[in-house]
Amino acid sequence: MSDYKSSLNLPSTQFSMKANLANREGKFLKKWQNDRLYDQIRKQNQGKPKFVLHDGPIYANGDIHIGHAVNKVLKDIIVKSKSLSGFDAPYVPGWDCHGLPIELNVEKEYGKVGIKIDVNTFRYKCREYADHQVMRQSQDFQRLGILSDWDNPYLTKDFKYEADVVRALGQVVKNGHVYKGHKPLHWCTECGSALAEAEVEYKNKQSEAIDVKFRIIEDSVFNVKKPVSVVIWTTTPWTLPANEAVALHSELNYVLVDIGSEYLLLSQSLVVNSISRYDIKVTIGERMFSSSELEGLKVQHPFYDKQVPIILGDHVTIDSGTGAVHIAPAHGQEDFIAGLKYNLPIDCPVDAKGVFFKEILLLGGQFIFKANASVIRILKETNTLVKHESLTHSYPHCWRHKTPIIFRITSQWFISMQQNGLRDIVNSEIQKVQWIPHWSKKRIELMVDNRPDWCISRQRFWGVPITLFVHKKTGELHPNTQMLFVCIANRIEQEGIEAWFKSDTKDFIGDDVNDYDKITDILDVWFDSGMSHFVVLKVRKELSNVADLYLEGSDQHRGWFQSSLISSVAINKKAPYKNVLTHGFVVDKDGKKMSKSLGNIISPQKIVNNVGADILRLWIASTDYTGEMTVSDEILKRSADSYRRIRNTMRFMLANMNGFTQKNLVDTKAMLDLDRWIVAKTQKIQEAIIENYDTYQFHYIVKSINNFCSNDLGGFYLDIIKDRQYTTQKDSPARRSAQTALYHITQMMVRWLSPILSFTSEEIWQELAPNKKSIFLQEWYLQVDTIDNVVFDDGIIYGTMISSHISQEQREGLEKSDDIFTSINIVRIISPTIRQAIEKLRKDKVLGASLEAEVDIYCNLKVKEKLSKFGEELRFMFITSDVRLHSFEEKPNNAIEVDSDVLQQVAIVVVKSEHSKCVRCWHHRKDVGSNNKYLELCCRCVENVDGDGEVRKFA
């Protein structure tokens, strides 16, 4: 047997089948960084229409989690797709660097402020800590393939940012939106005043720990016949008169415990510990209730004639107690915030000396700590006390009197939602914004309608100061307040917030020093981050005053979306964004949120290290982010399978462009019909993909690409052209036509993929266009001539067999469509039936390869007419050695009818060829051996090996 391998055009490419993403991606990341790719993109796109996606600042604390990855990757996909569409789309990352979590972490290392570390050193350490966290998180984000201005992020701790926040506060004050109100603080009943954090020390104290029943009024959700009570645990019985709600943890599940006469509702994770403390026999129910199911239910106060709601709060302890706490907004920081969030009454029943006001039922005139015994007695009388025990624990004390202190509501600074019509203007601006998904508009409308005034002051150390001077007697602001804002902001821009805290009051107001108090409160960190429109969008020249898009998790309707909107309206009466897009939370396969306590966390770092960032990116893009986003090892495995399908498709096309350059491009009109068809199909898909990028529907894009790879390419076109690619002459018009099609398809597809599979797309681009710059410096591939009048609905065929259910528009489109393309669509409908028949014969060991088969097609006259157009090339379309056409009336009994809703009167019979196999093309043909010089070849191969080469027209 002769070896004809050298006469074949075998595929070859450097693009490997094995992705090895975890290792390979790092090389591309390094190249992007070394080439300063982000700067190249900015330079190239300068002057183009702008699209500004404004990054919500991530909190600079701890490792990034899967939710962070989802958020940043979605943003990256949008920015990259906008660049492809011809926009200048800068992406400036941001970090939120002030606030309590950073303070707590610094305290863990250095101790309490004012005790172990002075306040100025403490702030310096907070800056240092934030810097380190930003560096770590930035590296993790870059590893995900996110292109951004990582060298120039915006940080809320930057001196310029802090100064501009002070300037922004000045504008809000000037516009009449700020007033002084109330909030709970540490309170010493001996001093009769609030205490600063530095004036508080912790000592052991014996407290009365009690478990108390709150009977649930609306218990239909449980579908039980006995009463149900939620059990709270508290160490401050005296606060129960101020109760306004019961809080459950947002991430905990709850179960019913049958104690005989009634059910107790307890946290599933704490139920065993709780009932062991109660020392009672119970039956624990199997059904679990999520806290969100219970939110809003009403419960009966244990001894007052009032009902209060069940709410959610992340401050509920998850390692002790019952998983439920009672909420007294006047007596606790978290309780107060919960009260604001849920618009609860905030009434303080206790005077400055810690005595209940006389009008307080059952307890009037009693000192709070002595009233504990009275509260416990009342609970016993009302049969609502489940457990009482004494507990020794660390408790805050006054540093002067060494006595226990309490939380008591006191004055704070607020932004009024009513003054100067702020709420109305905010609502008006909401109507001008495009909210995605559409139902999120209603969500933020309700939140704005129901929200209380915004408490912007905090009694902490690490944050932007409220730079106000207040008259000691009248409470009025200094008459030169606006001028002082300018002066103080200029100082802070040079020295940071320390300029305010270190300075003497006299430095700013001179002789008025004795008449005014300097405010030492800091701003709520949401005010910090919410002012990024004023500090970043308005200031950085590559951005714009109003962002085209804000994109964050759905929780930010209550957070950054709202703080940005309110602060922007408070300054200039306009929303800071044109569009707002929200994504859901990431949950595990059981629909549970990721949390350490549940042990169900899947970290992005682990995914990247194991399977690569592109797999993570593909999962994110393929998931409908408008709801909860489910992730698991199995789901990631499916993403990896999808990735392999895409990679193998791209590899096949690259390998079959071996020896092809742009000089070999064939004009569209001169291409073979099948090649024109697939290019036109690709163009149509590209139109839909670009539209889906524009509307942020990425899961449709992934679905389209997967279907295209599996059905149009891998399941049809690529299989058909293998024969032409391998067996025709190297420079034959037929082969160059197919390579031209592959070139156009790959050029389009690599761009479709680049916002999602960023590393892989760069790898493809290096193979496809090694002398060109990065794929991220390209725009959509529109260079190929548009092929018009093409209908691709595989289920609609023009002719007598058209189903009656198709629309007139579809019918007219078919009549205008290219006739040969309709014939190709017919082939696509018939092909699966032929493949199934061949596969059955394979299993029965009648056939080996599909080229051992010959096919007889029995069809009506219209189908026969259309398939006849392919002539001898019809066999290539069905990847068999021969195809014969017959009238439908001639079909034998063993014929298999094509199962199609619209293509009628078509049946097939597959038989094994009786002819010899050509050793070069593997077709079984009658003419094998007819040439004395090439006895093992068919005439077609003889022509390709030792002649002018075969001529193809269709396939």
Curated annotation (Swiss-Prot):
Its EC number is 6.1.1.5. A motif ('KMSKS' region) lies at residues 593-597. It is an enzyme of class 6 (ligase). ATP binds at residue 596. Keywords: Aminoacyl-tRNA synthetase, ATP-binding, Cytoplasm, Ligase, Metal-binding, Nucleotide-binding, Protein biosynthesis, Zinc. Its main location: cytoplasm. It comes from Vesicomyosocius okutanii subsp. Calyptogena okutanii (strain HA). It is found in: Cytoplasm. The keyword Nucleotide-binding applies. L-isoleucyl-5'-AMP binds at residue 552. Zn(2+) binds at residues 918, 921, 938, 941. Pfam families: Anticodon_1 (PF08264), tRNA-synt_1 (PF00133), zf-FPG_IleRS (PF06827). One of its GO terms (biological process) is isoleucyl-tRNA aminoacylation. IleRS has two distinct active sites: one for aminoacylation and one for editing. The misactivated valine is translocated from the active site to the editing site, which sterically excludes the correctly activated isoleucine. The single editing site contains two valyl binding pockets, one specific for each substrate (Val-AMP or Val-tRNA(Ile)). Gene3D superfamilies: 1.10.730.20, HUPs, Valyl/Leucyl/Isoleucyl-tRNA synthetase, editing domain. One of its GO terms (molecular function) is tRNA binding. Its cofactor is Zn(2+). InterPro entries: aa-tRNA-synth_Ia (IPR002300), Anticodon_Ile_BEm (IPR033708), Ile-tRNA-ligase (IPR002301), Ile-tRNA-ligase_type1 (IPR023585), Ile-tRNA_ligase (IPR050081), M/V/L/I-tRNA-synth_anticd-bd (IPR013155), Rossmann-like_a/b/a_fold (IPR014729), tRNAsynth_Ia_anticodon-bd (IPR009080). It catalyses: tRNA(Ile) + L-isoleucine + ATP = L-isoleucyl-tRNA(Ile) + AMP + diphosphate. The gene is ileS. Monomer. This is Isoleucine--tRNA ligase. The keyword Ligase applies. Catalyzes the attachment of isoleucine to tRNA(Ile). As IleRS can inadvertently accommodate and process structurally similar amino acids such as valine, to avoid such errors it has two additional distinct tRNA(Ile)-dependent editing activities. One activity is designated as 'pretransfer' editing and involves the hydrolysis of activated Val-AMP. The other activity is designated 'posttransfer' editing and involves deacylation of mischarged Val-tRNA(Ile).
